[in-house]
Amino acid sequence: AENFYRTGQREESLQKLSRILERNPDNRRAEVLYALQTVAQNPAKAKELVNNIEPVGFIGEMAEAVRVLSQFSQTRINSEEKSEAAQHVNASVMAFRSGLVEKAFQESIEAFRVDKDFMDGKIRQILAALLIYSGEESRLAEKYRKEILSVL
């Protein structure tokens, strides 16, 4: 399941994780991986699954990514906020919720380029969480890791 996750094969990973969790519901590693891969579809449930996990180590980093993305997916920028950064963040949230991770990366990067301090600098955390979400060895992670490093 982890190998599928790392390479961005979400469906295959979720199928394996579901079977693992049916047999062993206390498997924290599988639970965190499952939460990470389902946070776009069910942010509140995903956040609940990782609620008691400290942000330390590999599992902790994934749990923190779930918390960041859960909050991000529920973000609603005030419609009176007309800044370019706000428009990009809103587009990124909509893309993420729709499963369009590449578009979410693009819009988040643009929001960061326009205003590095928008949302009190949380865009950095969102970009890092999107990298973790996409799978560390996936094509998307490779592509956007380089671009993110160039704008930071």
Cite the ranges covered by each PLM segment.
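Residue-level signature for tetratricopeptide repeat
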Residues: N3, I20, A35-Q37, M94-S98, ...
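Terminal, low-structured helical/coil segments at or just beyond the last alpha-helical repeat
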Residues: A129-L152
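Short coil turns that delineate tetratricopeptide repeat
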Residues: N24-P25, F58, K116-F118
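Canonical positions in the second alpha-helix
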Residues: I20, N52-I53, A111
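TPR-adjacent "capping" and linker segments in tetratricopeptide-repeat scaffold/adaptor proteins
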Residues: S18-R23, S70-Q87
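"A position-specific structural signal for the A-helix of alpha-solenoid helical repeats
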Residues: L33, V66, A86, N90-M94, ...
